[in-house]
Amino acid sequence: MTNIRKTHPLMKIINNSFIDLPAPSNISAWWNFGSLLVICLILQILTGLFLAMHYTSDTITAFSSVTHICRDVNYGWIIRYLHANGASMFFICLYMHVGRGLYYGSYTFTETWNIGIILLFTVMATAFMGYVLPWGQMSFWGATVITNLLSAIPYIGTDLVQWIWGGFSVDKATLTRFFAFHFILPFVVLALAAVHLLFLHETGSNNPTGIVSDSDKIPLHPYYTIKDILGALLLILVLMLLVLFSPDLLGDPDNYIPANPLSTPPHIKPEWYFLFAYAILRSIPNKLGGVLALVLSILILAITPLLHTSKQRGMMFRPISQCLFWLLVADLLTLTWIGGQPVEHPYIIIGQLASVLYFMILLVLIPIASIIENNILKW
């Protein structure tokens, strides 16, 4: 008799996706981040669900309800900090996942890559709206500043901002709708992740060499499931160290001050995982130009398949491109640092140079380096 997992309509889908899936025999730990992202998403949905049971999306009680969760609800503090730091872990895994895709040329799977970009935007939107919910100073002013950017859109900008706010400023209507969207979007992310996986399984996984590995596949289970469990344990270890020892390390102290529309914090800044994009936004003096640069800093990923000039897929055997890739990583870390600094000399010029370099590396330097490498190898 054939095994039920290979015949049952539902079990068959699970089997073909997570058990008997043919995987390349040489994929490294950089291929662990997909499963880690699923773990992060499930953790965020579960902790978020329990937080939503006690949270009230009203400007008067929102801040107190978060305090109530931490002080009075059984294990509320750990649920709250797991959710807040879980978001940080989510973005660390996301950026490493995208970085892996750029390094090893996984963007040549265009459908999978484009769904991934949509996923990135959706997760960023979800995280932004979640940051508004505790209704601290940084929540309120972050929401005001970031939503206000839409007013840079010609003709409809101002009306659009007021439509999103549900009034003439960030207020109760804004908080309520942000809570509604913050609750529903993770399920949209879950659905998109399933589509992402569907497209990936049409082509099969890439591998570090970038060479077609159809002749040398191994089943996902037990080889890569056990490897994923190791990654998951490390993820949980780092998360628990953060939550139990320094839960506010990555947060902003200003968010422990209740939102006050009459008092502006000295430095308005988003969560650390948006600082690189925020630095790019601030480096352009023009409002519309800044907003365009902000959107393009992520959307630029969509044109990477068109900019691929190398005869090889990944960067494993391309030393010049490797140097540029790590320069890009260093540049992004610089932008993250600049995004958290006040707008004054020398931070302004450093931010502008780092922003120009970011676009230069992706649009100009890597494609040119790839052509040089092709010529060196006489391809």
From Swiss-Prot:
Cofactor binding comment, as recorded: Binds 2 heme b groups non-covalently.
Binding residues for heme b b562: 83, 182
Molecular function (Gene Ontology), one example: metal ion binding
Binding locations of a ubiquinone: 201
PROSITE patterns the record matches: CYTB_CTER, CYTB_NTER
Alphabetical list of SUPFAM superfamilies matching this protein: a domain/subunit of cytochrome bc1 complex (Ubiquinol-cytochrome c reductase) (SSF81648), Transmembrane di-heme cytochromes (SSF81342)
Localization per record: Mitochondrion inner membrane
Pfam family, one: Cytochrome_B
TM ranges: 33-53, 77-98, 113-133, 178-198, 226-246, 288-308, 320-340, 347-367
Recorded topology in the membrane: Multi-pass membrane protein
Record key words, sorted: Electron transport, Heme, Iron, Membrane, Metal-binding, Mitochondrion, Mitochondrion inner membrane, Respiratory chain, Transmembrane, Transmembrane helix, Transport, Ubiquinone
GO cellular component: mitochondrial inner membrane; respiratory chain complex III
InterPro entries referenced in this protein's UniProt entry, alphabetically: Cyt_b/b6_C, Cyt_b/b6_C_sf, Cyt_b/b6_N, Cytb/b6-like_sf, Cytochrome_b, Cytochrome_b_C_euk/bac, Cytochrome_b_N_euk/bac, Di-haem_cyt_TM
Major location category of this protein: mitochondrion
Positions that bind heme b b566: 97, 196
Disulfide feature: none
Biological-process GO terms, alphabetical: mitochondrial electron transport, ubiquinol to cytochrome c
Cofactor(s) named in the record: heme b
Similarity-based family: Belongs to the cytochrome b family.
Function field: Component of the ubiquinol-cytochrome c reductase complex (complex III or cytochrome b-c1 complex) that is part of the mitochondrial respiratory chain. The b-c1 complex mediates electron transfer from ubiquinol to cytochrome c. Contributes to the generation of a proton gradient across the mitochondrial membrane that is then used for ATP synthesis.
Note: Heme 1 (or BL or b562) is low-potential and absorbs at about 562 nm, and heme 2 (or BH or b566) is high-potential and absorbs at about 566 nm.
Subunit structure: The cytochrome bc1 complex contains 11 subunits: 3 respiratory subunits (MT-CYB, CYC1 and UQCRFS1), 2 core proteins (UQCRC1 and UQCRC2) and 6 low-molecular weight proteins (UQCRH/QCR6, UQCRB/QCR7, UQCRQ/QCR8, UQCR10/QCR9, UQCR11/QCR10 and a cleavage product of UQCRFS1). This cytochrome bc1 complex then forms a dimer.
PANTHER family registered for this protein in UniProt: CYTOCHROME B (PTHR19271:SF16)
Protein name (database record): Cytochrome b
Organism: Pagophilus groenlandicus (Harp seal)
Gene that specifies this protein: MT-CYB
